[in-house]
Curated annotation (Swiss-Prot):
Protein name as annotated: tRNA 5-methylaminomethyl-2-thiouridine biosynthesis bifunctional protein MnmC
Cofactor(s) essential for the protein: FAD
EC number: 2.1.1.61, 1.5.-.-
NCBIfam families according to UniProt: MnmC_Cterm, PRK01747.1-2, tRNA_MNMC2
Membership in a protein family: In the N-terminal section; belongs to the methyltransferase superfamily. tRNA (mnm(5)s(2)U34)-methyltransferase family.
Region (FAD-dependent cmnm(5)s(2)U34 oxidoreductase): 261-654
Organism (species): Pseudomonas aeruginosa (strain ATCC 15692 / DSM 22644 / CIP 104116 / JCM 14847 / LMG 12228 / 1C / PRS 101 / PAO1)
């Protein structure tokens, strides 16, 4: 990812962008709009296909070369004009050199007709970093998944069924990698039966390569001065489903109603993602209101725990950060959240070495190193060291994010009721005592470690870690703090009249009453972060017994990745894949015995602000048969079945 860079552009006398790297235009100099409508929209018969979509149905477009986003915006404009209200559009596009936001704005200004759609795209075009980036528009009716990186690296990671392809890289002679047999094979793997394809080129080697991959191709009239272009239909075999224990359950058909148990961030995000797709969701919370447990802290930090080695957790964090950061634009900045940045201090030699590796691996607009003097000027207080600065990060008031998500139309909240789930016929029923409060064909468990109270999830290896935060009254002197600063703990600039300081880690205690010892421990964490800020707060003179705070349980898994996805019936799973206990390399051709309509979203640990909202989108994609918003390997690394598989291979049953 260290080679990730934005597009380098030149601008011609008409204000149109040209790629400096490829020496080519992004669209027709005569009429880019008409070219897009002819080559991509008409060739793929999108007007009639959009109009024919049923309620809840989705059409997925795949694109090679996002460029200025012109093709996406034209497709969205057409979709909005002709598609039924209950239909949805998913658009997946790969781009190695995304435009910087200022360049994108300048390019899209050429098309005043598209201004409403362009402004919506520009409003979401932030925290756009390498990997999979999920953007949502029109209340969730239109989804855009950007794969930012080399197409030959990104497309093999994609799990999708594409109905229509836009092949729109720069000209084959100038960008041959985008027109290679390897790429055509990926298009075939990702294609739905009878998927259509349009491209501006008529090059013979492109036509032959697509035919070899399984597309029936023909030359058709091109646009403008271009005599011919290519049109095609996929007629090859369906792709191999892969390992059955990670295969998709059949997309949900029938009544689009769901129960979501748990009113924290994971539950609210899960409910919002389904409701945005037209589902009726009953959100059930045992407390009187939302965000009363780990999601209830006054300030949480958007802290990116990254690795220079592209681990599944690091890729999840990078994609999740962008998604959350875009969601936060809905909230009141300065009250519910603030993009004040996060500074991670290089508090010892090992941490300094880790930070140097990260700075070399990621773009500077995501993170960059600061010397001590630079860090102090930025933070506004004296610090013991420099560190790594994340300029787009900051703090969030998690209850506000939960409330915003739960306000999505289609969600009904049932609070103050603890429930158990029972399968009755084709529905899951939520019982409080002998009373069935709600029923639906689908249920999502999002109650952190308490998902183990539900028998199907009882054996999942989740653990609870108690954490306590301390609230400190802001002083005129402490208000100088301008960014979140982290070492072993963290301290945030004030929200209103209070700073939040934390957080402790206690692996043994089951008591949620705040303790003086942990308040003292948090003050020691603050002393390590900045003795100057400790003094500005007058913290040494504050009686511990007068300090306020709260404690909650984080929920984490043995590999520190969340559990997000469908759940299998354990005994049937063990029987279906018993051969793996003898030879883990076997892939039995037996369908996974899913528990019908049961899904999990749990185990987010201390990074739920980053991972839980995108996990809601991941669940919705599993359920609705949409493109996964994460690389397939990352989705599998978060799959609940990984622990059933691990126990089976290790011979650990029961």
């Amino acid at each position: 990812m260290s080679d990730f860079q934005h597009a380098q552009l030149d601008w011609d006398e008409n204000g149109q962008p040209l790629s400096r790297a490829f020496g080519d235009v992004y669209f027709s100099r005569h009429s880019g709009l008409n070219e897009t409508r002819h080559v991509f929209l008409a060739t793929n018969r999108l007007a009639e296909r959009f109009a024919a979509l049923g309620d809840g149905e989705v059409l997925c477009i795949g694109e090679t070369g996002f460029g200025t986003g012109l093709n996406f915006l034209c497709a969205w404009q057409l979709f909005e004009r002709v598609a039924p209200a209950g239909a949805r559009l998913e658009f997946v596009s790969v781009e190695k050199f995304p435009l910087a936001a200022a360049d994108l704005r300048r390019a899209l200004a050429l098309w005043p007709e598209l201004a409403p759609w362009s402004e919506a795209l520009l409003g979401q075009y932030l925290a756009v970093h390498p990997g999979f980036q999920r953007l949502a528009f029109a209340g969730g009716r239109v989804g855009l998944t950007l794969l930012l990186g080399d197409a030959l690296e990104c497309l093999p990671q994609l799990d999708a069924r594409v109905d229509a392809w836009f092949l729109d890289g720069f000209a084959p002679a100038k960008n041959p990698d985008m027109w290679s047999p390897v790429l055509f094979a990926e298009l075939a793997r990702l294609s739905a039966p009878q998927a259509t394809l349009g491209t501006f080129t008529s090059a013979g080697f492109v036509r032959r390569g697509l035919v070899e991959a399984g597309f029936a191709m023909q030359r058709v009239p091109g646009y403008g001065q271009k005599r011919e272009m290519l049109s095609g239909t996929y007629q090859g075999p369906p792709a191999n489903a892969g390992k059955p224990w990670y295969a998709r359950p059949a997309p949900h058909a029938g009544r689009r109603a769901a129960l979501v148990v748990g009113g924290g961030l994971a539950g609210c995000a899960s409910a919002a993602s389904l409701a945005a797709r037209g589902w009726q969701v009953t959100l059930i919370e045992r407390h009187p209101g939302l965000a009363r447990e780990a999601s209830g802290n006054p300030q949480g930090v958007l802290y990116l725990k990254l690795s220079a080695h592209g681990t599944p957790l690091s890729r999840l964090v990078l994609s999740g950060f962008g998604h959350t950061r875009r969601l936060l634009e809905r909230l009141r900045r300065g009250h519910d959240w603030d993009a004040c940045g996060v500074l991670q201090l290089a508090f010892d030699a090992k941490e300094a070495q880790r930070q140097a590796q990260l700075a070399a691996a990621f773009p500077a607009d995501l993170l960059h190193g600061l010397e001590r003097e630079q860090a102090e000027r930025l933070a506004g207080v004296a610090l013991p060291a420099g560190g790594l600065f994340y300029p787009e990060a900051g703090w969030v008031h998690p209850p506000a994010l939960c409330q915003a998500l739960a306000a999505t139309p289609g969600i009904t909240l049932l609070s103050g009721r603890a429930v158990r789930l029972r399968r009755e016929g084709d529905d899951w029923c939520a019982y409080a005592g002998d009373e069935c409060l709600a029923r639906a064909p689908l249920a999502i468990l999002a109650t952190a470690a308490d998902i183990r109270d539900f028998p199907p999830a009882a054996e999942l290896p989740l653990k609870r870690i108690r954490g306590q935060v301390t609230r400190l009254p802001a002083t005129p002197q402490s208000r100088a703090l301008r960014t979140v600063v982290c070492a072993e703990g963290y301290v945030a600039p004030p929200r209103g009249d209070e700073h939040t300081l934390g957080a402790s880690f206690d692996f043994k205690s089951e008591d949620l009453a705040p303790t003086l010892a942990e308040h003292q421990g948090n003050l020691e964490l603050l002393r390590e972060i900045s003795p100057d800020l400790l003094q500005r707060l007058g913290a040494d003179d504050l009686p511990l017994e007068r300090l306020e705070g709260r404690a909650a349980f984080r929920c984490t898994s043995p590999d520190y990745l969340p559990l997000v996805g469908p759940l299998a019936e354990r005994a049937a799973f063990d029987e279906a894949y018993a051969v793996l206990a003898r030879d883990a390399r076997q892939v039995p051709e037996r369908a996974c015995p899913w528990l019908p309509g049961l899904y999990l979203n749990s185990g987010h640990g201390s990074r739920g602000l980053i991972s839980a909202p995108l996990s809601g989108e991941l669940l919705a994609a599993w359920i609705c048969g949409e493109p996964l918003p994460l690389p397939r390997a990352v989705a599998e690394a978060c799959h609940p079945n990984r622990f059933l598989l691990r126990d089976l291979v290790r011979g650990q049953r029961g």
